[in-house]
């Protein structure tokens, strides 16, 4: 049965979710049984269509995009466009919307996201870490099995948690993890500024394109929501750097027993070819961040960067991720998983 989807918020993730859905077809993959029937996007429809077609990070969208009145048309599919800051003005029920992809970053609690249910949608998937009241937080490939039929508002966690969780799951199961510290070296995002402006966070006040900027991230702690055995064991921070896209997780953890570089690499290679195939990548080539641009996998382990201390108990691992594209593909994966639960 086709999942009828509305996207609320058409910024970086909203647009990439749409593109990822259609690019599957272009790349010869079977089309997902998902139909985007509506988008609530601020601004002019023609400009949003233009931004859908042309993208500075991901290039030209290989699909036909046009505007017909209040509709954006993608490869012949008519998508009703709305422009309102108030979701109470969106007629999801009239449009038969099954699932709202909440991509504004503003409705991250169940209490706020329920406005979509009140408007007639059946479920909501949030493209951000959720507040404590959401029904579940999932990373597809790691813990989507926790979903229950009565889950209504679900968080897809963050792009960084979607990278970290597939990386640590096999290591937790095979070696054990006592504690860990993570740094995400993260591409700048549009909540930063081009030139210095006033901001309550003095580092956030500085230009994103001229400095490396330390800032907070909840991704390390949030991994405990996805893998409860790690609750309270991880912490970390982000270092925003002047690149437009692709980020990398640098994780150092205390292992429960002595291990080696070869064992760590073997565990993650096996996982990447088995239970986490398509979710966890495995790389041995001397690549750099741009080489992972537009990669659909949310986590790509770099086996060449693994380090283990002399006593075998301190381990450092590295995983790349396209923080836009990989995460958007995960939104589609999670959407299918959420709507399949009966």
Segment roles from a protein language model:
Residues 2, 236, 248, 252-342:
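C-terminal active-site/capping subdomain that shapes the small-molecule cofactor and substrate pocket
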Residues 1-205, 309, 333, 341-342:
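N-terminal Rossmann-like NAD(P) cofactor-binding subdomain of oxidoreductases
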Residues 72, 138-140, 153, 212, ...:
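Short clusters of hydrophobic/aromatic residues that line enzyme substrate/ligand-binding pockets
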